[in-house]
A protein has these predicted regions:
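Short beta-strands and strand-loop turn motifs
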Residues: 173-177
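Active-site beta-alpha connecting loops in nucleotide-dependent enzymes
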Residues: 63, 82-151, 155, 179-180, ...
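Short amphipathic alpha-helix with an adjacent loop that forms part of the alpha/beta core around
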Residues: 122-123, 161-165
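Short, flexible loop segments at boundaries between secondary-structure elements
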Residues: 195-204
Length: 204
């Protein structure tokens, strides 16, 4: 896995192997390590010090709503992947957090259809999750029957059910895979509501 990046007249083939094995990033997943490798190669071409680059990468907290770790509730790690509004993005989130051979992810997904076939998510969801809470919507209608999932008319109810099913050591992933139309004003409203709900639980 690699990408070409052009630096002036130089074209370099970059993959994640150029990063130190012990470099821990806040955002999990091989795709995020590849992004970091691209950033490293560009910064190194500007003659910046490797140690400073890697220190900055290790301290980078990530981007809000993109596999963002926002805390723990009763030993359950919570990731906010609200900006994943396509099936492909939700698949990437699941694969980033999945542990081989274990189904330790509790997933909250669902929403409004946006002209992308959502059925591509079904196999990955089945392999990686122990419980799925879906937000009602036109996209959810296309996958609900294929999944052993509960459908909810509010995000609050979905989070409540997901946390009730999760156990210490599990991961709760909020990765909608669909648009926010209908239940929310926009995706920013959806993001803010999720963070507010989790903050309330974490404070208990």
């Amino acid at each position: 896995l690699g990408r070409k990046v052009t630096l002036g007249q130089e074209v370099a083939l970059v993959d994640a192997s150029i990063l130190p094995d012990d470099l821990l990033l806040a955002m999990p997943g091989e795709h995020n390590r590849l992004n970091a490798a691209l950033a490293y190669r560009a910064l190194a071409a500007l003659n910046l010090d490797d140690e400073e680059i890697f220190e900055a990468m290790a301290s980078f907290p990530g981007v809000e709503g993109r596999l963002q770790f926002i805390g723990e509730v009763n030993g359950v790690r919570i990731y906010n992947d609200n900006n994943s509004t396509t099936p492909q993005a939700t698949i990437a989130g699941l694969e980033a957090l999945a542990v081989d051979g274990e189904r330790k992810i509790v997933l909250i997904a669902g929403g409004a259809y946006k002209n992308v076939d959502p059925t591509m998510m079904i196999d990955v969801i089945d392999r990686a999750t122990k419980y799925v809470a879906l937000l009602a919507g036109t996209g959810t209608d296309l996958i609900a029957e294929e999944l052993d999932a509960d459908v909810f008319d509010s995000l609050t109810a979905a989070v409540e059910s997901a946390l009730a099913r999760a156990e210490a050591g599990d991961t709760l992933l909020f990765s909608p895979g669909f648009a926010s139309f209908g239940m929310f004003r926009n995706e920013y409203d959806r993001n803010d509501q999720f963070v507010k709900i989790i903050t309330t639980y974490a404070a208990e």
